[in-house]
Amino acid sequence: MNTFSLKIVTSDGLCYDGQAEELIVRTVSGDLGILAGHCNCVAPLGMGMATVKIDGEKRYGACIGGMVTVLDGNVKLVPTTFEWADQIDADRAYDSEGRAKRILGDKNSSETDLRLAEARLKRALIRQSVAGYKPR
């Protein structure tokens, strides 16, 4: 299968730099699949699972916010946060879910706290889901 150059970069550093056969990411408009020869584009990322096919093997990651760009066969994924499935601390994700649900259930929570808790809950659920896709 044909490959393309893929870089996954966050503010914490480089997560991946190499060839890939396929990338599927969640954008704010829905899922975007990228193969070699994809047209140039820029898209804002939503929150979801990223699937990267490398040497015939699929790897999964929790990809939150940011941008994806395709330019002349080079793909750059620049999410706000990115964690490969095997790097996710599932216990921490479950703790985050519990904290967010407590805030959402508190009648005294401010509108700002509720919005932040909703985002935290969504991130926690995505991280839990992706952690279940660890390559074996």
PLM feature segments, named:
Residues 1-5, 133:
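N-terminal export/targeting signal detector
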Residues 7-99:
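Compact, glycine-rich, soluble single-domain proteins
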Residues 82-136:
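Acidic/glycine-rich phosphate/pyrophosphate-binding loops and surrounding catalytic core
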